[in-house]
A protein has these predicted regions:
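Short, well-ordered alpha-helical microsegments
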Residues: 97-100
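Iron-sulfur (Fe-S) cluster-binding modules
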Residues: 1-64, 77-89, 103-112, 116-142, ...
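N-terminal glycine-rich "phosphate-gripper" loop used for MgATP/nucleotide binding
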Residues: 91-95
Length: 223
């Protein structure tokens, strides 16, 4: 799922600026799982903000509300009334949730309280590892389930560069070479023929905002 990390208190305080009534909106989805923006984190951040404002003798109110999923308007029930009484909103959701919150309340300044970092897995509580860049052209079928876009420092599509040495990346001796691992994985599966065909490079240029409509919903959203 999406992984995020909380912004510094200083940056958040600077964002809310002169606004007197702050509503901090958390998300019970991805950011809750990675301990960055769920109900508990909303409570903790609000406590820090109240202490800060009290020390600075700034008279501000800080309220909190957590929706199950901030990236889906169906879960915004109960938030409208609270948002109406706030001067500004803080979002502890990922970038997508923050933007939907801003779209829902266009007359309210919305400030992110977390930085969205990557799409990844849980290795252990508090330890997360990037696995996907959401490139839109998944190549895992021929790389043994190892993503070269994410794992390779150069994002190479057709084997390792000349700097790989004993299974390590030239960027750092502690970094495994993605293509070495891909080779080992495919060899174990007797699928080394996957490496023989040349794959076209990723088309990164001229990218615009992407929209996904799943199969079966085309007619519903046809223009």
């Amino acid at each position: 799922v999406v992984k995020a990390t909380r912004k510094s208190l200083e940056e958040i305080v600077e964002s809310v600026g002169s606004f007197s009534r702050v509503l901090n909106v958390g998300c019970g989805g991805c950011v809750s799982v990675c301990l960055a923006g769920g109900q508990q984190e909303v409570t903790e951040l609000n406590a820090e903000l109240r202490v800060h404002f009290k020390r600075k003798k700034e008279f501000k109110t800080v309220e909190g509300f957590t929706v199950e999923r901030q990236c889906n308007l169906q879960f915004y029930l109960g938030l409208d009334e609270l948002a109406e009484s706030a001067d500004c909103l803080l979002s502890m959701a990922c970038g997508a949730g923050t933007q939907l919150l801003a779209e829902r309340y266009p007359d309210k300044p919305v400030f992110p309280a977390v930085d969205t970092v990557f799409i990844g897995i849980d290795r252990a509580p508090g330890w997360y590892e990037e696995k996907c860049r959401a490139c839109g052209e998944c190549v895992l079928a021929y790389t043994g389930g190892i993503c070269p876009v994410t794992r390779c420092a150069k994002g190479l599509f057709n084997g390792p560069c000349g700097g790989t040495n004993e299974g390590k990346c030239e960027v750092g001796r502690e970094i495994p070479c993605a293509w070495y691992d891909i080779y080992v994985r495919l060899k174990e599966q007797n699928r080394l023929e996957c490496l023989l065909s040349i794959k076209p490079r990723m088309q990164w240029k001229n990218q615009s905002q992407r929209t996904l409509i799943q199969r079966g919903f085309e007619k519903r959203y046809a223009k």
